[in-house]
Amino acid sequence: MRTMLTCVARSALRQTSMSAPARACFSASAPALSSRSRNYSKQQQQQPVARTGLKDLHPLPESMREQLESSDTPQEPYTASGNSNDPAVHSSRPASQPAEPEVSPRVAAPGLVNGSSSKNGSPSSASSNGASSSGASSSGTYSSGNASIPISNISEAWGTSFAGLGERSFSKEAIDVLMAPINEADVEIKPDGLIYLPEIKYRRILNKAFGPGGWGMAPRSETNVGQGIVSREWVLICQGRFVATARGEQEFFKPSGVPTASEGAKSNALMRCCKDLGVSSELWDPRFIRQFRKKHCIEVWAQDTAGKKKKLWRRKDDPPFEYPWKETGTA
């Protein structure tokens, strides 16, 4: 009996000793597993994400990269990403004119002195006492050899200058070309009855009077883009002298038409400037307009594809209106 009780007691003690370490093991392992998962999640959050840098997208030569990385701030003419840092690249304004001419006026325009030639066809010579052989003197003249030529018409800031305005008239040959009667065969009429001279005709008259390169147009203001209209002020320069200024206008119907409208505004300004030279001045004479319409033009009824009728003007020697208009009779 005693032996049986001893065996039962030993088995009970053995089971108790085995269950205690097991409970301790399980209780100790549970928090260890949870802390390991928390540490793993923190490491996952703190791990940096790989991104593509600007240096990989825009590789630069090693010499340029070392130069840019060595300095604290980007140097000209490139930033650290390889983009240009020059203000002239990002500006639409033309570069400023040089303070002094780089080419001698005698080489660029032989025989011309401030826009006109002397009677014998040679440039007027100036006294060479104290004048250097090259460079600009303090009196505003450019010396080359034994001749001193004014440079006021070479480096003028035509955005604000009025140099040569009303100084003297042009030569008789130029005046005869500018003031010649208008050739009625060159005059066109719009469907609304407005008569005009094509812009290329004005350029041909100026080329005939002053020669190619003897005149030009310079912008007087920035391009003004409004609601469906572009305008800009231009100045007409002939033989290095200010002649006239006018603001040209041109309509446009969509944003992609702004560049073309800018060119149209320049042509419109040229036409208005030519009024001061007397070119085709008859186009602003009401009596000439009435006589020209009666002699060379005809007003007709025209019908569009929708059946709407409208009065339109055309020259008598022009063919009838085409699609989408169809002439139905004389008005």
Curated annotation (Swiss-Prot):
Residues 40-49, 70-86 have a biased composition (Polar residues). One of its GO terms (biological process) is mitochondrial genome maintenance. GO terms for molecular function: DNA binding; single-stranded DNA binding. Residues 32-143, 312-331 are annotated as: Disordered. Pfam families: Mgm101p. Residues 53-68 have a biased composition (Basic and acidic residues). It comes from the Eukaryota. One of its GO terms (cellular component) is mitochondrial chromosome. It is found in: Mitochondrion matrix, Mitochondrion nucleoid. InterPro entries: Mgm101 (IPR009446). Keywords: DNA damage, DNA repair, DNA-binding, Mitochondrion, Mitochondrion nucleoid, Transit peptide. Residues 1-40 form a transit peptide. Residues 114-143 have a biased composition (Low complexity). Performs an essential function in the repair of oxidatively damaged mtDNA that is required for the maintenance of the mitochondrial genome. Binds to DNA. PANTHER family: MITOCHONDRIAL GENOME MAINTENANCE PROTEIN MGM101 (PTHR31404:SF0). Belongs to the MGM101 family. This is Mitochondrial genome maintenance protein MGM101. It comes from Mycosarcoma maydis (Corn smut fungus). The gene is MGM101.
